[in-house]
């Protein structure tokens, strides 16, 4: 093994628990946690930077920085995909000329996939014989690259496979304002070349779990010789609010054809003698 360089990781985690209300018949408790992590490549052994798949490992940048062409949208008159050329001048600044040929557009460091913050928020309620708890998970500031976009968003290059629903927003006539190029059979100038068009925010809030339970009155159970009886409903991954909903937002980095987490529902009966 060879030491490749130096990297600094920093972060903070916060957890807060509270008993919000507690009376004879009602109680409400809350648990909240938050984490913030970041890293930076300080030094590389042999080169100041190198490309590793969809990432660039570069001094001064986060380890998981996506490195691609920068998508510039669609020409409203022709429907052609546009890219920023991103040529560096003598001061190291990138030019922002729009070109239709992706070969004239240089890849640049774009987004760090690591979320800025992530965590969970759990609440538990008890009222007489009823209990309810739910857990929300959240993540903000992260990104992912849709590696399947070269098939699902190929703008007509191949008609063998299915296409993304985003193709409904494609350019169709001069004057259309959209970020999806025209759909042309055999299109070799579409927007499916490796670019920031396939980079998406992973910001989301998810109802990770929910449990609703009903406890039978003790007076009923004593006659039956039962210590406790409870029926409940539970569910996981019930709702998700996401900035981009074409694939599971909990997936980060380079995302392909993956099965999303399933919604699950369960009913149960607990008996204690």
State each model region's role.
Residues 139-230, 235:
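Extracytoplasmic gating/loop element in the C-terminal half of outer-membrane beta-barrel translocons
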Residues 30-32, 134, 231-233, 269:
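Membrane-embedded beta-strand positions of outer-membrane beta-barrel proteins
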Residues 28, 39-55, 141-170, 241-248:
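Outer-membrane beta-barrel and related beta-rich outer-membrane complex signature
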Residues 2-9, 53-80, 163, 170-175, ...:
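C-terminal beta-signal and terminal closure region of outer-membrane beta-barrel proteins
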Residues 24, 129-134, 219-220:
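Repeated loop/turn-to-beta-strand initiation elements of outer-membrane beta-barrel proteins
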Residues 10-16, 117-123, 130, 207-212, ...:
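Hydrophobic, lipid-facing positions within transmembrane beta-strands of outer-membrane proteins
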Residues 3-8, 12, 19-113, 153:
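Conserved small-residue
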Residues 18-20, 34-40, 127-129, 138-142, ...:
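Transmembrane beta-strands of outer-membrane beta-barrel pores
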